[in-house]
Amino acid sequence: MENRRSSGGSGWWVCVLPLFTKDGPAYFLHSSSDDVSAWRQWPLYIALLIVAVCAVLVSWLSPGGCAWAGRHKRGRVAIPGPKGWPIIGSLMDMSVGLPHRKLESLARLHGAKQLMSFSLGCTPAVITSDPEVARELLTSPHFANRPLKQSAQQLLFGRAIGFAPNGGYWRLLRRIASAHLFAPRRIAAHEAGRQADVVAMLDDIQKEYHSKGVVRVRRHLQGAALNNIMGSVFGRRFDMSHENEEVKKLREMVDEGFQLLGAFNWADHLPWLRPLDPLRIHARCARLVPRVTTFVSNIIEQHRREEQRRESGDQCDFVDVLLSLQGEDKLDEEDMIAVLWEMIFRGTDTTALLTEWTMAELVLHPEAQKKAQAELDAVVGHDRSVKDSDIPKLPYIQAVVKEALRMHPPGPLLSWARLSTEDVNMGDGMCVPAGTTAMVNMWSITHDPNIWESPYEFRPERFVVFEGGEEVDVRGNDLRLAPFGAGRRVCPGKALGLATVNLWVAKLLHHFEWLPHAEHPVDLSEVLKLSCEMARPLHCVPVTRVPFAKFSD
């Protein structure tokens, strides 16, 4: 029985091969009974192949492609969208180039700005470029879950805030983070740490300029961002100007984690590819997880040995908070590792890249830079440095950051999608079936000329009320500009991120004038990884305008 199954399943090529020999069909006149049996099964293989091809083609003809076959019947009107390629759908559009721009073009082509269907292999997906539909997708309880990526499942054990399914455990994590890490009083309590990080960054920038005549800005921003989150989460900071072995290993782990979480993995959408691991996602995650576990576990154990640190005061870090939890709130070690490591991934990438985009625009627009510096001189002067309390008095600085967020949203597709938990009627007769991956093209919304005047121009004044602009809340209340998402799954660290970026931009502009470098012109080309970053890192010349060494921050 076993041998017969083997010859029947793979013996078709034995029948076909003789047709191409000099004996041709005469081969079968002298063939064994097993070969003749294989030949008789050949029509069955042809029939099955024809049926499979027809099934693929029929499903492919559905709007949105293969994964949408039969799903449009749940609504009165089919959701328009591209067919893509048979079997793989629109996977190429998502994995090559800039998917937010490609999807925006496809939505225009299919008249599907409100809602567009498309297939990612076996995954049915929808995307919107409309603020009102975006509000429904982001705030409806029917879209409160996230599709789980293989890399997130392995690196974060599916237990971190970003990917935990909607329910009691997720609500517990959200409550803990909101109360003990991202609450306004906690953000204010850690101002001294943020000031120390930015002063160290300014010093390193000045040293690099004096030694090389040009500064590669991103690495300084990433080092400061890593120290900022390490200080508030783990209670540790590093000297980024002199990388020891521990700092080097930490940077390597963070960089590898960024790459893995940001990689578009075909195996997430074509399950039969998972055992093959064509992009080596599984293998790389398997190598990284033990290193991450060891690193975080050592810090947790160190905190356990220093019990006197765990006090109720504002200066305790997030590890102290997690260790102090009791009863039903207490997390096991694996959950703690997932939550703490997620803070590193989510807390460093966006802050550094948004600051880099902001500074790049200011180098390209010296008139905006001078205007921001004039505001700083009027409010802060030259006799002290910028503090958190100054930021509300610096509306133009805040407008500059908002405009950078509008032009270069760190997550142009809001980083991680949503997953519908049941059929949802979206209006106009369209229905999003349960189990559909739902996305918002925030880049398309922030570059829509029907929403924003001259959307491709850098104009911070559009957000300055006393200059005829409009006050726009970027924290998720106004879906015309919601770079941190909205609803239950809004980024919990949005307030900390904005406070950090506003302070950094203000201090960078206060202490230096930023000029372009002749050999490294500013290039705003994009590359989408975990976040959308500058394809060519920013290089520029910082000229001291207010010496920072004399200030004690």
Swiss-Prot record:
The family classification in the record reads: Belongs to the cytochrome P450 family.
Q: Spell out the PROSITE patterns in the cross-references.
A: CYTOCHROME_P450
Q: Which organism is it from?
A: Pinus radiata
Q: Superkingdom, according to UniProt?
A: Eukaryota
Q: Could you say which enzyme class this protein belongs to?
A: oxidoreductase
Cofactor section = heme
The GO terms describing molecular function are:
heme binding; iron ion binding; monooxygenase activity; oxidoreductase activity, acting on paired donors, with incorporation or reduction of molecular oxygen
Question: What taxonomic lineage is listed for the species of origin?
Answer: Eukaryota, Viridiplantae, Streptophyta, Embryophyta, Tracheophyta
The keyword Transmembrane appears for this protein: no
PANTHER family in UniProt: CYTOCHROME P450 78A7, CYTOCHROME P450 78A7-RELATED
EC no. given is 1.14.-.-
Question: What does the UniProt keyword field contain?
Answer: Heme, Iron, Metal-binding, Monooxygenase, Oxidoreductase
Question: Known Pfam families for this protein?
Answer: p450
| Name this polypeptide is given | Cytochrome P450 78A4
Query: Which residues are noted in the entry as heme-binding?
Result: 491
Q: Does the keyword Cytoplasm apply?
A: no
SUPFAM superfamilies assigned: Cytochrome P450
